[in-house]
């Protein structure tokens, strides 16, 4: 007679074998915490973990599945190679596109200005308008934006709206019937209940971008929902403070390529040939902006790598604004070592975020970083901005949170700014938020609190 232990062992063994084969044959480099969590879960709770792994276990997609545009850089002479900055060398090694010039940068001081810039972007589109968002709200702002998109399509502009398949359920189920009737193309990225996407339903598209005529880009951390634009003191609810920007320039063309790839993956259609050919770049540097996409469609974890590099190369200061702070041990150590080297590290997070588990998971990292000498500021608002500044040499601003889900699982999009004047503008934005924040004071955690924090950190890669 077969015992319960035999059945348990058989299922656990099957799960571990499939996990090992899947990771090896697909060459999936998993983060250590994720690998350990999957291994222990499959060993102890195979009945739960095995089905979850089949649905959520994949971390990278093959390039054959996800049609990918490649950049190759011209070979530099020995003399010019000496003059190339370390940031440029790293970007090339990661296969990122070129740094390009930009014009008319507008860093939105609040939600009202962000919405005004978005409305202008939609209204001024003449040929194409591509929008990617994690959440499209069933609310006042969502309705207002829908009306503008419908009007845009009715005047002959090709309008495409890409919404994450999971994010669609988070802020009310919006009906897009009227938009489609107006001529707007609507697609959902990896819907969670689509069986053909088995193993990929955990890959969320967290990118936020609006591209008009492949020449104007609106991007940052805001979703297209009312609370992301209502951050004035007049509101009775807790303010959501976010950071977006817009500008003109060639970077919008690079963003279009990323959108085309995401759209093709969501609709299962081929990318137009003009957007899917290898691009050869000259060796010349331009001190401007660079698109930094990251996610399952990239062989490297680009944003994570740039953050690690920034921590180790910073000489004077590091500024971070993020809603969730659940770094992996490597990134936390890099920040602590920066403190020990005398680098001024300032971290701005909300006093309490909209994710209770993320707040519990962050406690250990906050205590350790504060003890290393960092200044940690607690914003009374629901800070949703994502910005990382390293000296006056690099600012990364966009959609990525400082947690393992954003850095290792989600499709994310950041913009790297290299001009010191612009970097100082983003620094000033963070400092303004700090003025309303209180300084974090670490408290010693008891045994039960540490146990609870440890259990939550065990699944931190899924938060």
Model-predicted regions and their roles:
Residues 1-304, 309, 353, 367-371, ...:
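N-terminal localization/anchoring segments of enzymes in phospholipid and broader phosphate metabolism
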Residues 154, 158-159, 317, 343-346:
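Residues at the starts of beta-strands that form the adenosine-phosphate
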Residues 307-317, 340:
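Long hydrophobic segments that form regular secondary structure
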Residues 324-345, 350-351, 355:
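Helical hairpin unit composed of two closely spaced alpha helices linked by a short loop
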Residues 343-402:
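C-terminal structural cap/anchor segments
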């Amino acid at each position: 007679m077969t015992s319960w232990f035999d059945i348990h062992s058989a299922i656990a063994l099957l799960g571990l074998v499939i996990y090992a084969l899947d990771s090896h044959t697909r060459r999936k480099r998993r983060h250590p915490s994720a690998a350990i969590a999957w291994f222990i879960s499959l060993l102890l709770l195979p009945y739960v973990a095995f089905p979850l792994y089949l649905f959520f276990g994949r971390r990278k997609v093959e390039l054959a599945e996800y049609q990918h545009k490649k950049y190759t850089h011209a070979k530099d002479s020995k003399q010019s190679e000496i003059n190339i900055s370390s940031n440029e060398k790293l970007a090339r090694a990661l296969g990122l596109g070129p740094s390009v010039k930009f014009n008319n940068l507008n860093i939105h001081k609040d939600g009202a200005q962000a919405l005004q810039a978005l409305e202008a972007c939609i209204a001024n589109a003449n040929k194409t308008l591509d929008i990617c968002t994690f959440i499209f709200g069933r609310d006042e702002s969502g309705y207002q934006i829908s009306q503008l998109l419908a009007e845009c399509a009715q005047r002959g502009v090709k309008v495409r709206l890409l919404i994450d398949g999971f994010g669609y359920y988070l802020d009310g189920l919006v009906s897009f019937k009227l938009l489609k009737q107006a001529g707007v193309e609507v697609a959902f990225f990896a819907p969670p209940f689509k069986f053909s996407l088995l193993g990929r339903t955990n890959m969320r598209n967290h990118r936020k971008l609006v591209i008009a005529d492949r020449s104007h880009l609106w991007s940052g951390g805001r979703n297209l929902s009312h609370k992301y634009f209502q951050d004035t003191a007049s509101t009775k609810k807790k303010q959501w403070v976010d950071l977006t920007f817009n500008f003109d320039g060639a970077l919008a063309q690079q963003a279009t390529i990323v959108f085309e790839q995401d759209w093709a993956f969501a609709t299962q259609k081929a990318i137009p040939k003009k957007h899917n050919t290898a691009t050869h770049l000259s060796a010349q540097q331009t001190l401007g902006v660079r698109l930094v996409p990251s996610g399952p469609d990239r062989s490297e974890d680009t944003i994570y790598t740039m953050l690690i590099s920034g921590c180790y190369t910073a000489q004077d200061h590091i500024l971070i604004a993020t809603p969730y702070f659940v770094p992996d041990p490597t990134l936390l150590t890099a920040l602590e070592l920066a403190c020990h080297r005398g680098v001024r590290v300032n971290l701005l997070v909300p006093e309490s975020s909209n994710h209770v588990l993320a707040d519990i998971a962050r406690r250990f990292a906050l205590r350790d970083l504060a003890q290393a000498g960092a200044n940690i500021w607690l914003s009374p608002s629901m800070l949703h901005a994502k910005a990382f500044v390293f000296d006056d040499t690099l600012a990364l601003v966009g959609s990525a949170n400082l947690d393992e889900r954003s850095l290792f699982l989600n499709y994310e999009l950041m913009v790297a700014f290299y001009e010191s004047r612009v970097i100082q503008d983003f620094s000033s934005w963070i400092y303004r938020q700090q003025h309303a924040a209180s300084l974090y004071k670490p408290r010693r955690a008891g045994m039960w609190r540490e146990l609870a924090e440890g259990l939550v950190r065990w699944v931190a890669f899924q938060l």
